[in-house]
């Protein structure tokens, strides 16, 4: 009797594994070198086949540390001084999280095809929206749809690309891209998006395999640029309708990059304590600031005021001043350029 049941169980496991493999194999198109084409492409899935999360649960750092890898990345979000970490190990399976963090409706997003993480306010024209995953991509970037108007929105910049909300934008919410090791050290009492999602997934496994480390892409893009390797990591910064890309490797030799976007002086800096990159407009009412890094923080040469990595002056003549924070999104270069073909590229 046991032998018969054992064979039945083994057959179920075998065919279940085969069906799981077949799903991913058929979902993913044959890879190819990036080339130009229409920005919209079918994603080989149906709507909501990749399940976005709604009203997620959270766990402690100690609990999450049982399975998260120290070098794994995630998205850090702060509201009223409280911190949450949304690990890529979970996001890669769900792509979007409809969260409410201390009363603030947020949409936390991750595109495995672009390795881009971005956070938005879920309210559109004062109405709170819930989002799911769409059945197509735009410039190799996942599209999300809102369940009120069925409009589809690009993950990388939060712009409605089709539907009744065409052309509208979700308001970006500040976030930082950090490793689990850096985040748990900086915020040991913070909350972590729980692996208890209600879905059966192996959150220690990346279903995209070697995609993030090779130079092949799965979906065509409308525009491409060869100044950087296809999947070189950049931090994309937007200022109004203008944008700039800062290669991750630029922060290896410098922790502070001074630049000008659309005539506006900006600074992008790396916080050595958390490994995160943030960007700000660096002009005040009376000064265009130039920064250096010191043990106490970032110090401007013009007034010798000391600034935190969040752009707040905590000491000196400008104490109490806050720099205007600019939307900063980590991404593969090919995705960022396809979405922002007029972007400037930092190369100094």
Which ranges hold each PLM region?
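N-terminal secretory signal peptides that target proteins for export/translocation
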Residues: 1-3
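Mid-to-C-terminal functional-domain signal that highlights helix-capping/loop sites
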Residues: 5-348
């Amino acid at each position: 009797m046991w032998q018969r049941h054992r064979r039945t169980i083994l057959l179920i496991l075998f065919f279940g594994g085969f069906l799981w493999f077949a799903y991913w194999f058929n979902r993913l198109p044959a890879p190819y070198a990036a080339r130009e084409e229409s920005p919209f492409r079918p994603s080989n899935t149906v709507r909501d086949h990749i399940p976005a999360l709604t009203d997620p649960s959270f766990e402690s750092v100690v609990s999450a540390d049982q399975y998260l890898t120290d070098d794994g990345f995630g998205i850090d979000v702060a509201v009223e001084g409280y911190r949450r970490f949304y690990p890529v190990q979970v996001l890669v399976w769900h792509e979007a999280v409809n969260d409410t963090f201390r009363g603030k409706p947020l949409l936390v997003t991750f595109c495995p095809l672009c390795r881009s993480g971005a956070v938005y306010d879920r309210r559109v024209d004062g109405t709170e929206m819930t989002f799911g995953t769409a059945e197509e991509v735009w410039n190799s970037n996942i599209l999300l749809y809102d369940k009120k108007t069925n409009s589809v929105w690009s993950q990388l910049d939060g712009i409605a690309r089709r539907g009744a909300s065409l052309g509208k934008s979700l308001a970006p919410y500040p976030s930082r891209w950090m490793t689990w090791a850096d985040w748990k050290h900086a915020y040991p009492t913070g909350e972590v998006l729980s692996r208890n999602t209600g879905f059966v997934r192996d959150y220690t496994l990346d279903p995209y395999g070697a995609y993030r480390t090779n130079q092949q892409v799965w979906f065509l893009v409308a525009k491409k640029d060869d100044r950087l390797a296809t999947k070189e990591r950049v931090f994309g910064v937007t200022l109004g309708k203008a944008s700039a890309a800062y290669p991750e490797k630029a922060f290896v030799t410098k922790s502070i990059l001074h630049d000008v976007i659309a005539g506006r002086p900006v600074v992008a800096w790396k916080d050595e304590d958390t490994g995160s990159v943030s960007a700000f407009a660096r002009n005040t009412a009376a000064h265009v600031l130039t920064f250096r890094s010191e043990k106490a923080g970032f110090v401007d040469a013009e007034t010798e005021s000391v600034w935190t990595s969040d752009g707040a002056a905590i000491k000196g003549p400008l104490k109490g001043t806050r720099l205007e924070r600019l939307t900063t999104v980590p991404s593969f270069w090919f995705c960022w350029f396809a979405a922002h073909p007029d972007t400037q590229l930092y190369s100094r």
